[in-house]
A protein has these predicted regions:
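C-terminal motif of bacterial Sec signal peptides marking the signal peptidase cleavage site
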Residues: 15-17
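An acidic, glycine-/histidine-flanked metal-binding catalytic module
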Residues: 22-54, 61, 103-120, 130-227
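Amphipathic interfacial helices
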Residues: 86-95
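Short, flexible, solvent-exposed loop/turn segments with mixed acidic/basic and small polar residues
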Residues: 74-87
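Helix N-cap motif at beta-to-alpha junctions
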Residues: 97-102
Length: 227
């Protein structure tokens, strides 16, 4: 029933556009408000599970992050979906392990405990032609999914700016990664923005994809520091 309702509203939004807010858009807004409210309700549970997982593997978990109404609406338009179809209105990241080969153990633990609590929704492994890879476990609540990403220390370092990396994993781990790899944090995002830019030529895209692959290769598996 909700699926049919969603399709009708989606067509209305796509056809009329955001500039013509009629009754259909008001219904879309109502669903958005409800989905965002549920994300706030389910967020603390999601964060607690992420922290439990992080503690099991001597890692850390980021504070729960909620999509803004504006960001959620843009994603609905980009993905041609409705608010309840979004799986990351509330999301957090578990940062654990130094070797990418060990991520599977973290994911398996996360799947096990969410299954025991009847909250497991789906597992997705992401890959790309520019070196990025990631693992996502979605929790399924009554009518909305939330998201827990799983990353190694190196992959987290690759994707986020220095301030956030230091705040999340601590200065000691940050300095260790930099001393071992010699690369700056957050460059994966810089390369990605250039790769996806409409103004980038094919040669530019190919060049930065190669830089990105090399960058991720360096950070994929880092020797565990001596305790």
């Amino acid at each position: 029933m909700r699926k049919a309702y969603s399709v009708i509203l989606l067509l209305a939004v796509v056809v009329t556009g955001c500039s013509q807010r009629g009754p259909e858009q008001s219904l879309f807004d109502q669903q958005m408000d409800c989905a965002l409210a549920l994300a706030q309700e389910y967020g603390p549970i999601t964060e607690a599970i992420a922290r439990q997982t992080a503690e099991e593997f001597d890692g850390v978990a980021t504070e729960i992050n909620y999509k803004s109404p504006e960001s959620a609406e843009r994603k609905c338009q980009t993905d041609s979906c409705m608010p309840f179809d979004l799986k990351d209105l509330a999301r957090t990241t578990v940062v654990a392990t130094w070797d990418s080969a060990a991520v599977g153990e973290v994911v398996e633990f996360l799947i096990t405990i969410t299954t025991e609590q009847e909250l497991f929704g789906r597992y997705k492994h992401q890959t790309s032609d520019y070196g990025y890879w990631g693992d996502i476990v979605n929790l399924q609540f009554d009518s909305l999914m939330t998201e827990i990403q799983v990353k190694t220390y190196g992959m987290f370092y690759a994707a986020d700016p220095e301030e956030m990396v230091r705040e999340t994993i601590g200065d000691e781990r940050y300095e260790y990664i930099y001393s071992v790899t010699g690369v700056e944090p957050g460059m994966a995002h810089v390369y990605y923005e250039i790769i996806r830019a409409d103004t980038s030529s094919e040669a530019t895209i190919a060049h930065y994809k190669q830089l990105s692959r090399e960058y991720f290769r360096i950070l994929q598996s880092i020797p565990k520091p001596d305790e």
